[in-house]
């Protein structure tokens, strides 16, 4: 029982930690490419900015889904037999 709870706690930490790292790297790369493309073609800044914010929201949504799954495992643990 304690072994399962320890492994679930470790898994929750990995889900949140790796999800945060992945989301931050993705948003950083996307922001860098946005700045590069807006410097190259300044007349497209409005269109690119709209698309960048939509994609940033989708990247954050994927991270928040991972956080929700980690919270499910932490508080309503389906691996522990009742």
From Swiss-Prot:
Similarity comment: Belongs to the ATPase C chain family.
Transmembrane segments: 7-27, 53-73
Organism (species): Delftia acidovorans (strain DSM 14801 / SPH-1)
Protein function: F(1)F(0) ATP synthase produces ATP from ADP in the presence of a proton or sodium gradient. F-type ATPases consist of two structural domains, F(1) containing the extramembraneous catalytic core and F(0) containing the membrane proton channel, linked together by a central stalk and a peripheral stalk. During catalysis, ATP synthesis in the catalytic domain of F(1) is coupled via a rotary mechanism of the central stalk subunits to proton translocation. Key component of the F(0) channel; it plays a direct role in translocation across the membrane. A homomeric c-ring of between 10-14 subunits forms the central stalk rotor element with the F(1) delta and epsilon subunits.
Membrane-topology descriptor: Multi-pass membrane protein
Pfam families, alphabetized: ATP-synt_C
Keywords: ATP synthesis, Cell inner membrane, Cell membrane, CF(0), Hydrogen ion transport, Ion transport, Lipid-binding, Membrane, Transmembrane, Transmembrane helix, Transport
Record bears the keyword Cell membrane: yes
First-listed, main subcellular location of the protein, grouped into a coarse class: membrane
Cellular location(s): Cell inner membrane
Site (Reversibly protonated during proton transport) location in chain: 60
GO cellular component annotations of the record: plasma membrane; proton-transporting ATP synthase complex; proton-transporting two-sector ATPase complex, proton-transporting domain
Protein name: ATP synthase subunit c
Description of how the protein assembles with itself and partners: F-type ATPases have 2 components, F(1) - the catalytic core - and F(0) - the membrane proton channel. F(1) has five subunits: alpha(3), beta(3), gamma(1), delta(1), epsilon(1). F(0) has three main subunits: a(1), b(2) and c(10-14). The alpha and beta chains form an alternating ring which encloses part of the gamma chain. F(1) is attached to F(0) by a central stalk formed by the gamma and epsilon chains, while a peripheral stalk is formed by the delta and b chains.
GO MF term set: lipid binding; proton-transporting ATP synthase activity, rotational mechanism
């Amino acid at each position: 029982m304690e072994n399962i709870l320890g492994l679930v706690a470790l898994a929750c930490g990995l889900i949140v930690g790796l999800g945060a790292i992945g989301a931050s790297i993705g948003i950083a790369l996307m922001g860098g490419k946005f700045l590069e493309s807006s410097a190259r073609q300044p007349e497209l800044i409005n269109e690119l900015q709209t698309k960048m914010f939509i994609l940033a929201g989708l990247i954050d949504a994927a991270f928040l889904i991972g956080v929700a799954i980690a919270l499910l495992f932490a508080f309503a643990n389906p691996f522990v037999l009742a």
